[in-house]
């Protein structure tokens, strides 16, 4: 069955983004927009789409939750041996996209990823709920499993193993930090004349900024 969606559209008219709103580097604006998303109680305000690619250019994306924006790096956590973990190990060039429908806003980031220091991953892992820590230990993320019962049984066994004890971070799980080289801010506007501003990192570590056509 064919599906046609050409009649589904809406106008974006809630906000604007002008040159006077910009900051010398993109980081203050990133902080402001993330705070706006949290304060507006948008659905999953820290959700971010992570785009990776194999060395020969085959892309894949998935949504994760940003856990920190620290030292001008975007930090999230996952399994090092997952599909994204393997792709980032082989090709560190990644992109991130934040989309807040309620604010009619989007941030797109391009940069290079690195593995976060182990002590920082340990510190974050210790803050996770008990069941989330157990789940991180037993999930062979992105690999085929016989069925849901397999992962449930593994979870139950690991839960019993660490009952009343500290659940240690597995060696296969930890943080990733993305250092940006390009950041685009997109604000929806009427008649599809959206506001777009692109920051690009210069060789001297300063940032250029240009308005882009919608």
From Swiss-Prot:
Entry keyword annotation includes Oxidoreductase: yes
Pathway: Cofactor metabolism; pyridoxal 5'-phosphate salvage; pyridoxal 5'-phosphate from pyridoxamine 5'-phosphate: step 1/1; Cofactor metabolism; pyridoxal 5'-phosphate salvage; pyridoxal 5'-phosphate from pyridoxine 5'-phosphate: step 1/1
Cofactor(s) needed by this chain: FMN
Enzyme class of the recorded protein, top EC level: oxidoreductase
PROSITE patterns the UniProt entry points to: PYRIDOX_OXIDASE
GO MF entries: FMN binding; pyridoxamine phosphate oxidase activity
Alphabetized UniProt keyword annotations: Flavoprotein, FMN, Oxidoreductase, Pyridoxine biosynthesis
Binding residues annotated for substrate, in chain numbering: 9-12, 67, 124, 128, 132, 192-194
Keyword rRNA-binding among UniProt keywords: no
One of the GO biological process terms: pyridoxine biosynthetic process
Positions with a binding annotation for FMN: 62-67, 77-78, 83-84, 106, 141-142, 186, 196
InterPro entries: Pyridox_Oxase, Pyridox_Oxase_CS, Pyridox_Oxase_N, Pyridoxamine_oxidase_dimer_C, Split_barrel_FMN-bd
Reaction catalyzed: pyridoxamine 5'-phosphate + O2 + H2O = pyridoxal 5'-phosphate + H2O2 + NH4(+); pyridoxine 5'-phosphate + O2 = pyridoxal 5'-phosphate + H2O2
Co-factor remark: Binds 1 FMN per subunit.
EC code(s) of this entry: 1.4.3.5
Organism superkingdom: Bacteria
Subunit structure: Homodimer.
Family: Belongs to the pyridoxamine 5'-phosphate oxidase family.
Function (record text): Catalyzes the oxidation of either pyridoxine 5'-phosphate (PNP) or pyridoxamine 5'-phosphate (PMP) into pyridoxal 5'-phosphate (PLP).
UniProt-recorded name of the protein: Pyridoxine/pyridoxamine 5'-phosphate oxidase
Protein encoded by which gene: pdxH
């Amino acid at each position: 069955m064919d599906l046609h969606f050409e009649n589904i559209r809406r106008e974006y008219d809630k906000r604007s983004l002008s040159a006077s709103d910009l900051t010398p580097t993109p980081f203050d604006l990133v902080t402001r927009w993330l705070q706006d998303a949290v304060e507006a109680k948008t659905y999953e305000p820290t959700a971010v789409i992570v785009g990776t690619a194999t060395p020969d250019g085959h892309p894949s994306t998935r949504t994760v939750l940003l856990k920190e924006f620290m030292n001008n790096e975007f930090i999230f956590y996952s399994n090092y041996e997952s599909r994204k973990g393997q792709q980032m190990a082989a090709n560190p060039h990644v992109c991130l996209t934040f989309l807040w429908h309620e604010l009619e806003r989007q941030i797109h980031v391009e940069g290079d990823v690195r593995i976060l220091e182990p002590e920082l991953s340990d510190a974050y892992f210790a803050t996770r709920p008990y069941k989330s820590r157990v789940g991180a230990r037993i999930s062979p993320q992105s690999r085929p499993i016989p069925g849901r019962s397999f992962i449930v049984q593994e979870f139950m066994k690991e839960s019993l193993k660490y009952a009343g004890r500290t659940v240690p971070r597995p060696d296969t799980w930890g943080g990733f930090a993305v250092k940006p080289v390009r950041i685009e801010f997109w604000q929806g506007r009427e008649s599809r004349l959206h506001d777009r501003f692109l920051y690009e990192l210069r060789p001297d570590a300063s940032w250029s900024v240009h308005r882009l056509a919608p």
